[in-house]
Amino acid sequence: MIALLQRVAHASVVVDGATVGAIDAGLMVLLCAERGDTEKEADALLAKLLSYRVFSDAAGKMNLSVVDTAGGVLLVPQFTLAADTRSGTRPSFTPAAAPDVARALFNYFVMQARSRHADIATGEFGADMKVSLTNDGPVTFWLQVKPVV
């Protein structure tokens, strides 16, 4: 499972002209399920994401997590993160989880996130979304948890 997280001053998702999710300062997270991912990978990725120290403390060091700062988390489904770009000029999405599996894992991830953190907003799985954000830094990290084979 993949999470591309960006520290933001604010972020929002619009679907069909309506804002479906928005946060102030926090993390905007593009989330992707890969083939073979299960709730185990989702749990591990969520634990890492919520405790990942990307916010500055009083000394200016990245020592605080989104939980420590009570920041928002905007979770946006993004299957293209699993693209295989090694060959040619058209990406292959074979590494991405099947849509029904990906939807179930995204919904599970959101449910678990809401049980562990107060400020969770989401995009809409399968929708054409317009995502807006103001990067803070910019600070961007790629987190990935692979199934143990």
Curated annotation (Swiss-Prot):
Enzyme class: hydrolase
Motif position, Gly-cisPro motif, important for rejection of L-amino acids: 137-138
Keywords per UniProt: Cytoplasm, Hydrolase, RNA-binding, tRNA-binding
Task of the protein: An aminoacyl-tRNA editing enzyme that deacylates mischarged D-aminoacyl-tRNAs. Also deacylates mischarged glycyl-tRNA(Ala), protecting cells against glycine mischarging by AlaRS. Acts via tRNA-based rather than protein-based catalysis; rejects L-amino acids rather than detecting D-amino acids in the active site. By recycling D-aminoacyl-tRNA to D-amino acids and free tRNA molecules, this enzyme counteracts the toxicity associated with the formation of D-aminoacyl-tRNA entities in vivo and helps enforce protein L-homochirality.
Family membership: Belongs to the DTD family.
Domain-related comment: A Gly-cisPro motif from one monomer fits into the active site of the other monomer to allow specific chiral rejection of L-amino acids.
Transmembrane segments: none
Gene: dtd
EC number assigned by the record: 3.1.1.96
Gene Ontology MF term list: D-tyrosyl-tRNA(Tyr) deacylase activity; Gly-tRNA(Ala) deacylase activity; Ser(Gly)-tRNA(Ala) hydrolase activity; tRNA binding
GO cellular component, one term: cytoplasm
Pfam families: Tyr_Deacylase
Listed name of the protein: D-aminoacyl-tRNA deacylase
Recorded catalytic activity of this chain's protein: glycyl-tRNA(Ala) + H2O = tRNA(Ala) + glycine + H(+); a D-aminoacyl-tRNA + H2O = a tRNA + a D-alpha-amino acid + H(+)
Subunit (UniProt): Homodimer.
Organism: Janthinobacterium sp. (strain Marseille) (Minibacterium massiliensis)
Localization in the cell: Cytoplasm
GO biological process, one term: D-amino acid catabolic process
InterPro entries in UniProt: Daa-tRNA_deacyls_DTD (IPR003732), DTD-like_sf (IPR023509)
